[in-house]
Amino acid sequence: DPFDDPTHGQQQLTFFHGYYRQYQYLPRAITCAENDLVLSLCLLYGSAHPALGADEDLEYVVRRLREAWPEVEIHLRGDSGFGVPAMYDISEQLEIDYTLGMGMNARLKKYSDSLLETALARFEGTGVPQRLFTAFWYRAESWPAQRWVVIKCEANAQGTNRRAVVTNRPGAFVLPGAAYDAYADRGESENRNKELKGGLQADRLSDHRYFANLFRLYLHTAGYNLLV
């Protein structure tokens, strides 16, 4: 997960980010869900795509983990910012399980319209919030082959909602809802980033030089890893 790090001076490689609407750096961390440790950290320039170089970071982390524990099972989770071909490709090359968010497009909406209508009708008829799932093989134009997509359709008092993930988890073919829930648990990683940024003040990157700020970020992260 990345997190925004607003800047207020003339730090090197800070740029305006359209989504966050501020000048910033964009740190990105790979966090282990088993122990909350930060395994890999980088400091992206302010307007970078969050997935920039993430495939290389992932390859390095997986290689180091397998050097220590050859039989370790690795499952990658990331939001739709990391749902890009490079991340699918490297995960499949490394033979690890992955579940990555995917932005809804016209085709996915078409495939899930009837399920969303069913969820809405059930909610309106019972007053009970509805949460339904569908899954199917899907191939985007930029993909070399089909991949398994799970779509969640919700209807409740707040309205309707659709979310999609791409996954190669074996259980997703039988229990797509469980696969989606395992993905949704990645929200805890966002909490770890909040602790790193707020509690450990990892956003204190006020030096003019990029590499000095990168070193500061490493120190903040080392302190965080000592505490978890």
What are these regions (language model features)?
Residues 2-29:
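Active-site-proximal, Lys/Arg-enriched surface segment
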